[in-house]
Each structure stands twice: as structure tokens, then as C-alpha cells.
Amino acid sequence: MTTNYSLVNFHLSAMIEMLMRKYSLSYENALPLVMSSNTYKTLLDRPYLQEEGSLFVCELLEKELQKEDVRSKR
């Protein structure tokens, strides 16, 4: 199974939107936060994760970010 960049982009947009809505982050702050996350790196490395729904992927990101204070990234 190869990386489906269309699905990766879909999940990337969903994760950014979730951060913007839930934590009131700007796009400029949410994008680098998502791009540097382990969730995004795993999404690129493990194609089976790309087939999961965006809700599941967003929950993975949220669990990862609970270890740090996301609001301090504003």
C-alpha cells in the first residue's frame, strides 16, 4: 500500500480545522503544529492510517497535544 496524498491532505485540513475551532488557533499557528506532530508523521509513514476517518485521526492528534498546552501556541 502506498501513500495516498489526497487522503493525507484531507486529514491535514481536518486536523488544522479542528485546532482552529477547538483551541482558537490561527491557521498560521495550527499548520506548523500539525506538520511537526507525530500524528502527521505517522499518517505519512503508515498508509493504513490514511484509510481511517478524520475523526479518528483528529483524536490521535488531540491525545498527542494533551501532553502540552496547545493554547500557549497562539
Language-model-detected regions and their locations in the chain:
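C-terminal alpha-helical interaction appendages
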Residues: M1-R74
